[in-house]
Structures are given as structure tokens and as C-alpha cells.
């Protein structure tokens, strides 16, 4: 019996060693309010050599925020890969009003986003992860296990989208500059109650990524995140990315599942209209009439 228990424990440990979770807990801050906590996080991240791109405070989620940053080394590696890899350039850090901090587990997200090219960026990804841990602390990971080997081709279940599913394409323009201008203009107009959180444009590689706040009171982030659980603070904001003249956004059934991999089917069904409603908002950002 003891041997069986020991064997089971080893098997469980082996499973966890081969699986990753999307978020890492940081150390708790002694901030008195959300604004103070955000300011402290920005200071810590800047002090670690990371560049603050923007701050996202989602409508309907008043007790949390996301600080979005970039790391020069990881950004250079992603620019070198090019194409859709640009969606992995921003790093999301979640902050709560009670001082709780969490951040994206970079290995998890970059294995999913860079896929077969992950190895090219791995040293830079690991170096950026060290900076995050030094700045914010490194507690236990959380959010739901996904086997490391499954991330490059991840989907929640049979029939659902993967990273490269065709319905990520929102609109195609004649060239890169036209595509970027359309996204910028539409975010400035606030189409479909959206707004810009950040942008990173790399004209020499013809790639760009924009963070998009979806502020619609009925179908925006506050609605569906509150239904499935707001602890995954560093899941937001969503991205629109441009490659050459094409504007893309990861489809909701993929992007949401990747950010909440332990979500039950019943919870998914409770937000079943979220992927299409979100796509409609992002289509408007892309310039779809």
C-alpha cells in the first residue's frame, strides 16, 4: 500500500512537472487602494528594466487592474520571429485593490503563442520571467494545468479553435500602414464602446499589436469575466494584431479557454455568446462595416 501511495505521488508530481499554469502569484502589496497598488507595481516593473505600455481598468471590474509591460530582450526575440508572434509581445500583470498581484506565466503563454518557434525565444522568455519574479515575487502558479506539450496546438476541446484558426482574421487591407491607421482611428473613435490600452507598432517587420478595452455595459469584459471568475486578472485586455495588411484577433473560444483552462463546460455555456459578441467589437476596431 505504501509503495502504491508513493507511486501515485510520484506520478502526480511528474504530471505537474510536465504541465504549466497561466498565472503566477506575486507578493502582496501594502497599498491602501487600487490606484496606489497600480502605482507601486508600475514602479517595481520599471525598476526591473521593463517598459510600461499601458494600464487597463475594465468597466464592471472596479477592484482590479492590469499593468501591461514589455521586456526589450523578449520583444527583440519576438520581432525576430515576426508574424503572429507579435501577439505575445505584451506582458500582463494583474493588480487587485487589496494589494494582491499576479502576472502572466511567460512560458505558458509563449509556448501557446510562438508554438514551433518557442525555442528561438526561450532564453529571452526565461530572462524576462526572472525580471518579473525579482520585481513582484514568485509565488505558486495558478489558473489550471495544461500539459506543456499541448500548448503549441492548444484547444479547449474537439471542434473548438486553435491559435491559427481561420476565424482570427478580421479584415485585410492593401498594406500594413492602412491596417494600422484603421485600427488606431477606430480605437480613437471608441467604436462599439472600445478604447485603446496600449499599442506596439514595428513598421520594419510590418507587425503591430494593440490592447483593446471592451467597455460595453451589456457584453463587455465586466459581464462575462464576472460570470466565470475575476481572479484571472492578468487575462485582460484582449489584443488586436496586424501582420502585413491583415488585422487579426484570437477568437474568443481559444483566447478565453487559454486564459481560463480549467473552466467547466457549464461555465462556458453561461457565456456562450461572448466569443461572437467580442468578435463583433473587434471587427469594428478592424474597420469591418
In which residue ranges do the predicted regions lie?
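Positively charged n-region of N-terminal signal peptides that target proteins for export
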Residues: 1-4
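N-terminal signal peptide c-region/cleavage motif recognized by signal peptidases
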Residues: 14-16
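Terminal, regulation- and interaction-focused segments at domain boundaries
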Residues: 19-60, 137-207
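Acidic/histidine-rich, surface-exposed loop or edge segments in extracytoplasmic proteins
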Residues: 19-29, 111-114, 160-167, 250, ...
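Stable alpha-helical elements in mature extracytoplasmic
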Residues: 37, 41, 121-128, 132, ...
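Mid-chain, structured segments of secreted extracytoplasmic proteins
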Residues: 63-105
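Hydrophobic alpha-helical segments and helix pairs
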Residues: 101-143
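A cross-kingdom marker for long, charged
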Residues: 198, 205-289
